[in-house]
Each structure stands twice: as structure tokens, then as C-alpha cells.
Amino acid sequence: MVSKITLLCFAITCDVLISMGTVQGVFNHSVGPLAVCSPDMEDARAYTENCYRRCSRNKEPSTHGYVWLYSDTAPKGGPVVTRCNKVRVKQVFTETWSFSFIKGTPTRMTLDVTEAECVAVMRSQCPTHNCNIKAPSELPEEYHYASDTEVVQDYLEILSMPSGLDYMEENLRITPSQSKFSFQLTDGKGQEGQYIYFWDTKYDDTKCPFDSFQSHGCDKYDSPLDLINCRESRFVIPSIANSTTLVGACQGLQKSTTGLIYKWDDRPDSIANDSKRIALTKNDQTAGNVATLRVLVADSLNAVDEDLCHTQCEMLDFILRSDRKREVLTRIGGSYLVVSKTSYIRQCRPLVGCRIVKPHYFCGNPNRVAIICHGKVWYWDPLKSYVDEGMNCERRVAGTKLVFAVGNHEYAIDDDMHVELPEHETYGISHDLLASSEDRISKDIVDPTELRNSWQSHIAKEGRMSIEPLSQDKQVSHWDAEFSNPLTWLTSAGGWILDMSHKVTLWATVFLTLGALVAGAKVWEIMRKANRKSQYKRTNTEPHDSQATWI
């Protein structure tokens, strides 16, 4: 079956054409990330043991009401930010005795950079701040016989990227892509570790970019649990005391510790079933003769909840014991986790209402596309169901493609907009934990041809990019043989003479050794033949008297 792909923001819409017949149809498939995950590894055993202890909770909530969830409706977030940093790239090239070549994997290390260095390069190479200057993904190859050659080059990288907006203070703050820090919009520049950011302070947007798209009936538990537990998908807002209240244009909204933008609508006296999670909170109309039944049903639901929670903990234990070839995203209660191949875990936070940033931005190694989720910009690898925090934005590695995972299949934007799918495979609409068919979340259609053209333009632009290293060095480590080198006096004439010295000496040694072995074998064979002849004796036979003589 051949399917033509059309991308929805984060759904795939396919016009299905079965090649063996005339049946046509359309299906949608969600391909967006569900969570953003920390790079920090944690002990999975300790987390699993804690998992069971976290399954118990209070039977009665403190109050109940509605949680309104908000999604970012801004087309591109905040202003374009130009990031500057210095990087040192190392790569080892090996030539063996048998003239084979081994190319090592490049390694990157971020160095300190000054504002003056960044400004000088931006003025000369990208004065409009539309910059895409990146260190090469691989260094020029350099080989020396029977040696390891470590090539080291330093580069200044300047990259333009989108940003998100924060409304946690009266003055707007911006958060650059993949950054954990926010900066005052009016500052025009900021520094995070070894990265320096620049942006235009004239950006002005007085409208709040967040719009409500869902409401959920929830139960609120005060300290020590300090959380909101909602119906539908069992999503949880933890540590509500630590939520941040937004101000300015977004006054009244709150941002949870996991990044969700929400508004709490307290309804303690509501008898509507959808205004709470378990609909068992006591009120005047349900008091009296139904009090006992209320308590019994609450106990039963609490037992069911604890059983489900323990089952999820057991599933996590099974995943940790299984043989995994890749990292696995799983959900335990209201939390997402990535389980590594080595049985460590990384904690994740849910993402809601993600959209592709326009104009499109891309990164390489691995290939990623920029997305915006509740006010923050991330670079997402479409082969994964989650976003990795804190990754560098490097050049694309030659020959690689931008690949989306479509169910159990992979679709490369670089290809001809068609993908082979099994004829009898069933497809449906896949959502994240908060999506429903009635929600008002934005699903802007993304033309796959437009995305493909942007990706190919990005590849062509990087192909034309010319960047000179700030400094370069190399270190050649020769594989010295265990004998005195009679030609070492030639090393002063230059490195190429030293290479020739090694080649001549090593191969002369090899041939001399082989010659000695052959000569030794010949001498041994001659000695063995001589010894064999000395063991033979000549015997003269005289005729006997009884012999007859014929006449």
C-alpha cells in the first residue's frame, strides 16, 4: 500500500491508496513528543522501591474544582536569538602497518568565549543576525604511517534560533531554545555558562500567547501530598505550592513545576460530576442516609487506585528486567520516565500542544526540528516520542535524513513524499495524555512539501558554509618498533621524512625477519637431508657356490 503523507501539527494525515485495488481513505497519526526528559541518570532500583510507597494517598481530597489547561498560540514565540560559543573539535585518524585507515569519532568541547569575539564575527559574517555558522561535523583527514594522528581545531559558532516568552514578571523575559535560563527582553543580551545570546529589544507583544483549550474535573490535596489529581488520563499537577503565578498580559495563570500552564477554578460546593475526579465529596444534598455508602464507595475506589498504581510499579520493574535495545519512554502514575538500555532512568515532564516553529529551524547530529510547547522552544528528534534537554545544535552529518516515526514505520522527509505501508494494518488517531476529540488545541496543517523544502534549503545552506578554524594543532603518535632506528637522524629534515623512515625501517624489519625465517627453514631442511643419508650403509653381495652356471 502506498500512502501520500500530509503533516498536521503533530499529526500525520495520509491519503491511503491501496496499490492492489481502488480503495482510498484518510487516516491521522500523532507524531508529536509526549514529554521532555532530563539528561541526568538516576538509580532505577531506588525509584522502583519508592514507587510502591507513593501509591498510598488520602481518601478524601481537600477540595475539588476545574483545571483549565492552556496552549501556546503564538506563531513563533519570542524574538530570534543569536547564540555564540567557542568549540574545540578533536578527531583521531589512524594508519596501520598494513596501510588500512581508521577514522575516529569527533568529540566536541565547549570553551570560554568573549563578547568582543562574538560581535566581531557577527559584524563581518552575519550583520543581520541571520546566522548559521557551525563547526564541521568531521575534520579534514590526515594520516601518517603506523601512527595515530590527533587533529584539534577551535571554531567560533554563531547560530540564530527561536525563543520562548516568559510572563513570570511584569517585564517580558525570553528563553532561548534548549536553555534553562530566561533573560529580560530589554537587556538585549545575556550569558549562560559558556554561551552568549543576543536579540533585538524592539520586539513587542502585549497579548498573552496562551489560550485555554481544555478543562478537567480535579481533586485537590493539600500538604503533605500537595497535588492536583484530575480525571481523564489521570494527569497530575505536583507540588502546587511551588507553581509560579504569571503576571502582565497573562495575569491569573500559573505555571507548574513540570511546565504546564494552567488555571485553577475552585468549586468546593459544586455537585456536578465533571467538577471533580471521584464525585464523592460531601455536600448538603448527599448528606445523611447516604454517608455510609459514600465512605464505602470511596474506600473501594481508593483500593482500585492503589492496585492500579502497584500494577504500574510492577510494569516498571518488568521493563527494567527486560532486554532493551533502545531507550523506552514509559508512564508511571502522573510521571513520564525514560528507561535506558543500562537500566537507569531519566525523569521527564509532560508536553502539551506542541507545534512546529515557523519559519522552520533545524539541527543536526541527530537531525531535529524546532518545536514550541507551552512557551518554550525545543529541538525534537522525530524518531523519538520525547525531547532531550540540553543538546547541542550541530551540523548535519553528510548522508543523514530527517526521519519521522509513523507508528511502526519510518518516513524520511528527504524522500519522494510516499511511504510503503502494509495493506491490512490498522491506523487510528493517536493523542498525548491530554488530547481529546473535543479539545480546542490548535492543529495547524503543516505542508510536508514546505517542510521538505525548508530542510533541503537548510542542507544546501550548510553545504555552502565556509568556516575557518580559529586555531589548529595536531599530534602524531608513531608506533615505534622495539629496535634502534638507524634513520632517526633524518627526522630533522621534516615530518614526511620521519614517515618514510618509519615505513622503510618497519618494512625492512619485516622483510629481514621473513628472510631469516626462510633461510633458517632452508638450512634446517639441508641438515635433515644430510642426516638421513648418513644412516644408509652399502653392502657387497658375493655369489654363492650353489649358484648354477648356464652354458
Swiss-Prot record:
Glycosylated by host. Glycosylation is crucial for glycoprotein export at the cell surface. Residues 525-551 are intravirion. One of its GO terms (biological process) is symbiont entry into host cell. The keyword Glycoprotein applies. Residues 1-25 form the signal peptide. It comes from the Viruses. Residues 26-503 are virion surface. GO terms for cellular component: membrane; viral envelope; virion membrane. Keywords: Glycoprotein, Host-virus interaction, Membrane, Signal, Transmembrane, Transmembrane helix, Viral attachment to host cell, Viral envelope protein, Virion, Virus entry into host cell. It is a single-pass type I membrane protein. The chain crosses the membrane at residues 504-524. It is found in: Virion membrane. Homotrimer. Interacts with matrix protein. Attaches the virus to host cellular receptor, inducing endocytosis of the virion. In the endosome, the acidic pH induces conformational changes in the glycoprotein trimer, which trigger fusion between virus and cell membrane. Belongs to the cytorhabdovirus glycoprotein family. This is Glycoprotein. The lineage of its organism: Viruses, Riboviria, Orthornavirae, Negarnaviricota, Haploviricotina. The gene is G.
